[in-house]
Amino acid sequence: MAHKKAGGSSRNGRDSESKRLGVKRFGGESVLAGSIIVRQRGTKFHAGSNVGCGRDHTLFALADGKVKFEVKGPKNRKFISIVAE
């Protein structure tokens, strides 16, 4: 029986699906209430005025207006606010 024995299978060959994180609306862009501004893991960006924070730390607009990024506080934290137009 001149048959080749089955070779071992590779232990690589899998990867997790990308989670599409990141900034969805940039500074100066107009948004409507409920629009997602940032999808993130943890609080890389913090919620400022008129911005809500979901349980997965997603930041979203609570009012219509323009997106404003700012760095403030003693720890130089990045805040995102919505400024009414």
From Swiss-Prot:
The portions of this protein that span the membrane are none
Q: Name one Pfam family in it.
A: Ribosomal_L27
* Top-level taxon: Bacteria
A molecular function annotated in GO for this UniProt entry is: structural constituent of ribosome
Q: Give GO BP annotations, semicolon-separated.
A: translation
**PROSITE patterns attached here?**
RIBOSOMAL_L27
Q: What keywords tag this UniProt record?
A: Ribonucleoprotein, Ribosomal protein
What residue spans carry the region label Disordered? Answer: 1-22
Record-level GO cellular component terms: cytosolic large ribosomal subunit
Could you say which protein family the record assigns here?
Belongs to the bacterial ribosomal protein bL27 family.
Protein name in the entry: Large ribosomal subunit protein bL27
